[in-house]
From Swiss-Prot:
SUPFAM superfamilies hit by this protein: Ribosome-binding factor A, RbfA
Native source species: Gemmatimonas aurantiaca (strain DSM 14586 / JCM 11422 / NBRC 100505 / T-27)
Alphabetical list of Gene3D superfamilies matching this protein: 3.30.300.20
Function: One of several proteins that assist in the late maturation steps of the functional core of the 30S ribosomal subunit. Associates with free 30S ribosomal subunits (but not with 30S subunits that are part of 70S ribosomes or polysomes). Required for efficient processing of 16S rRNA. May interact with the 5'-terminal helix region of 16S rRNA.
Subunit structure as annotated in this protein's UniProt entry: Monomer. Binds 30S ribosomal subunits, but not 50S ribosomal subunits or 70S ribosomes.
One GO cellular component, as annotated: cytosol
Annotated protein name in UniProt: Ribosome-binding factor A
Subcellular location per the Swiss-Prot or TrEMBL entry: Cytoplasm
One Pfam family named in its UniProt record: RBFA
InterPro entries named among the record's database cross-references: KH_dom-like_a/b (IPR015946), RbfA (IPR000238), RbfA_dom_sf (IPR023799), Ribosome-bd_factorA_CS (IPR020053)
Alphabetical list of PANTHER family matching this protein: RIBOSOME-BINDING FACTOR A, CHLOROPLASTIC-RELATED (PTHR33515:SF1)
Keyword hit for Nucleotidyltransferase: no
Gene Ontology terms describing biological process: maturation of SSU-rRNA
Stated family: Belongs to the RbfA family.
Recorded name of the encoding gene: rbfA
Amino acid sequence: MGEVRRPDRVAEAIREEVATFLSEGAKDPRIRAFVTVTAVEVTRDLRHATVFVSLMGDDADKKSTTAGLASVASHLRSQLGKSLRLRSAPEIHFRTDESVARASRIEHLLAKIRDEREAQEPAQDPAQDSSQDASVEASDAPDKAE
């Protein structure tokens, strides 16, 4: 199993710190959408960190939040330098992660297809099912006249 690479450990620590910062300390009024930190990737030299975020809200809120996140990146970088005790805190780059929205859309489409199929299938009467089962059992029974 080998040890975990240092950039991976730093990325996980950054993910936790950014999530805490956004839920408790982000004072930018442009950050109006619900923000979830989905992942963080850090370069080997620890100079750059790409923070992937999922944004929930309408398009205007998402656009505003994206601008707000870019604005707080430098403040967040200084906070990370203090809390993670790194010689040089990585430069923060925010990227929108569309995978959560895409997965939600796919789930919605699958549910719609399932509902349409259920609506198209004729509802079978349970009494008909039992009479059909009885006739099948009678035809499968061996002849006793032999």
